[in-house]
From Swiss-Prot:
This is Uncharacterized protein MPN_107. InterPro entries: SAM-dependent_MTases_sf. It comes from Mycoplasma pneumoniae (strain ATCC 29342 / M129 / Subtype 1) (Mycoplasmoides pneumoniae).
Amino acid sequence: MTNQNLQDFLDGVLLKEENLNKITEVSLEKGLPHLLDEGIHNEDNFQIFTSQKIVADMIKMVGVKEMKNVHTTVLEPTSGDGAFTCAILDLRLKNIKKSDSFLKEALTGLSTIYSVEIDEELVWLQRNNLYSIFLAFLKKHGIFNEELSLLVKKILMINVSWGELITETKDNENFVCNYDYFLRNKKTKKKPAKHKHEFPEGLFSNGEGKCKSLFVNWSFADVINEIAHNSNFYFAKIAKIPGEIIQFQIN
């Protein structure tokens, strides 16, 4: 996929006005949107939503300082309605000090959070949740305007993707995308008796299987660069219907 093809896709599909208009403000409680409860999302596709306690514990485990850093890239590839992404964005915005560059820092903090979710309904919920958190930040500082609102929506349309991140090659070797922090869990249609996460062998950055080694040190820009210029990577699918489902896969 060439840079021009990618730009055509962004302009012609992803960033169409009708898509941007779907992102709307939701009500907040204590600065955060009401996230879906743990448990069944629907009868056909069982979803387990991460509790805020586990989100908080994970952020502490990784390091609050790292999550506060607006330049730290984070990928959540099974992101639901945004339990992790909303918490990280909220943490970043609350810790940005008022200065001449604070708006730039805020936008950077948003633009370095990425997620992928296969359930389209949850993708839109997550975009709305993140948009509302950022909108509240803009209004708090009296800098809200339509131009900024549109920019935030465009960032969310690109960064919060409807699709599936493939993590295995044809040789069953695991493929890990390049982000500073990569949050990975395995979806299941069967409710586990105990809270348990399963991870593919080799997914851990140091191979030891420790929780903190779930996170690897690459960046989203590197992934896009590889997709655009390396024949070993390609867009496996781009939806023919309005939307932006993308699957990253290795030949």
